[in-house]
Structure formats: structure tokens, C-alpha cells
Amino acid sequence: MKTFPLQSLTIIEAQQKQFALVDSICRHFPGSEFLTGGDLGLTPGLNQPRVTQRVEQVLADAFHAQAAALVQGAGTGAIRAGLAALLKPGQRLLVHDAPVYPTTRVIIEQMGLTLITVDFNDLSALKQVVDEQQPDAALVQHTRQQPQDSYVLADVLATLRAAGVPALTDDNYAVMKVARIGCECGANVSTFSCFKLFGPEGVGAVVGDADVINRIRATLYSGGSQIQGAQALEVLRGLVFAPVMHAVQAGVSERLLALLNGGAVPEVKSAVIANAQSKVLIVEFHQPIAARVLEEAQKRGALPYPVGAESKYEIPPLFYRLSGTFRQANPQSEHCAIRINPNRSGEETVLRILRESIASI
């Protein structure tokens, strides 16, 4: 299996992301204000908690955008809010010709959107379809929807922008792991889950053009729809640690890749790194033992399933079946392959669990 994973940040680059975020926090939270627990409710004149507004300003600065909004519903809620701000029910949405992420498909169906599909790996085909069918907006997933995807996000967005097609990027699994996210590459808005970035449960973010963000804010009238100040502060507290933690994790994956392909575990046929959806190792065995390896691995401390996909709760390594979109693209692979995400563990822990699990079969 040949894959085209996204380029991870180096440790030095990740540190610079962290430092820039902290610098922005200092600009918006003078004195001891960052040490508070956050406020609640609809502050007069803001119609949201004051601390939440400041956190949103920090996020906008961090991602070089005009504005940002925190929303309920994690990554799915962010995508829903973004699409609703860009499109009216029944309009046409351009997507990559690949399996659509299941929760995103639900949003598409709820809005009654008509899908226009094209292979984003082929820029000439993309340009032709955009010119001929004139979609009302485009949804571009930053990470890979199928193993063979190789498109460069900035190139896809440049093609859409040249044609005047508004674009929303699903930046889940990419934020603070790569140099730039969608709104920094030409998308109108980026959407992502803060839960995946060591933040609080159920909080998502939309970052990008002010006019789109203002349309989202207009829907957040009631107090119950707000992200409260305490939740917003949790977003920043988690986000600060995300770039370096994920860079360390990427280094562990790279070393595991070399070890596994170098024969460290004889039962392993091959290993590749893929964004499926998180950046993980896809480990293929010579024999169809995937299900049994997963069963044994959890007895030895491996996580058997994700919580929020790299959330603050996921510390041991994850040994899990291939993602739904990858299985849909390669139905036979699930019997001989698994995905491994080191999370906060080192390569020796992953190798020990893998070897012991295979030996027990």
C-alpha cells in the first residue's frame, strides 16, 4: 500500500507554534485574567461570555484569520455550523470523489445538499467540473479520505478560489500537526474539534472569514448555545500542548515505521504511515490475524478504541481496526491490517505489546 501522509511539524517547528500561541494569549489576557475560571452567560453588548470572546480572538490570531467562533458539537458541530453559514438547504456542494466521513454525510443529508464529486488529486478535472457545474460551495477534507489520496490542500483551494467557489476545510486530525490549516491556505473557513486537541468534550471551532463567522454568531442567540468561559479556557490550555505532543508522537511513528519494515517483528509484512484519519501506522501482517492481534493487544494495555481521536484521555497506544473510509476503499485489508497510534507512548511499548500479542495467538 502506497500512501501520501501529510508532512508533520518538526519539534522545532512545533515549539514555534506553541510560542506563537502563548504570545497571542499574552496579548489578549493581561495580568491574572488567564488564571480565572472563566465567566458565564450573555454579557451585555457581546451576547456571549467575555472570556469566550477573548479565546476566539486568540484562535483567530493563531491561525492568521479574521475571526473565530467556538461552537457546540465538537468537529461535527463546527462543520455543520460552517456549511449552514455558506449554503442554503438544497444547494450544491462539491466534495472529493471518495467515501464521505459518516458524520459529515449526515449533515449533507439533513441540509438536503446535492453533491458534486470530483477527484481532488486531478486539478485539471477539478477545474473542469467547477467551470461546468458551478457548485455553490466546496468541502475539502485536509487529511486523507482514502490511501491513494495525494492532493496538496493549497493547490485544491487555489483552484476553487480562482473560480469563486467558497470553501470549507475539515481540518480535524491536522490542526497543530502541520504548518498551515485550510484558512491559512485560502479556504473561507477551517473547522475542527477542540476535543481532538486535548480540549474539553463537545467543543468545536470555526476559524476564517469574518462574514462567515458573523453568520454563525447570528445563530447563537440563546445562552444555552454558548461555549462558556470555563470551556473556552480549557480549549487554550489543551491547544498549547498539542503541537509539541503531536510532533513527539510523529517521531515515534517514524521510528516504528523503520523498525517494523526492518524486520523487528517477523510476522509483520509491511508498515506505512497514513492519515487515516489521524496520522497512524497501518501495519499489515503476512497472515489474516488482525482481529486476534487486536483482541490480545487490549489485554496488554493498548486502547481498544478511540475516545475523541487523540483526546486528553488517550494516553496508552491505540491498537484499532482500520478506519471506516479506508475499509470501504479496501474491503479485504481489515483481515490482515490494523492501525496503531502511539499516542503518548514510546516505540518500545508499542513493539512489546505487538510482539506479546502475536506470540499469544
UniProtKB/Swiss-Prot annotation:
Pfam families, per the entry: Aminotran_1_2 (PF00155), YhfS-like_C (PF22475)
GO molecular function: cysteine synthase activity; pyridoxal phosphate binding
Source taxon at top rank: Bacteria
GO biological process: L-homocysteine biosynthetic process
Cross-referenced InterPro entries: Aminotransferase_I/II_large, OAc-hSer/O-AcSer_sulfhydrylase, PyrdxlP-dep_Trfase, PyrdxlP-dep_Trfase_major, YhfS-like_C
Name under which the protein is recorded: Uncharacterized protein YhfS
Organism this protein belongs to: Escherichia coli (strain K12)
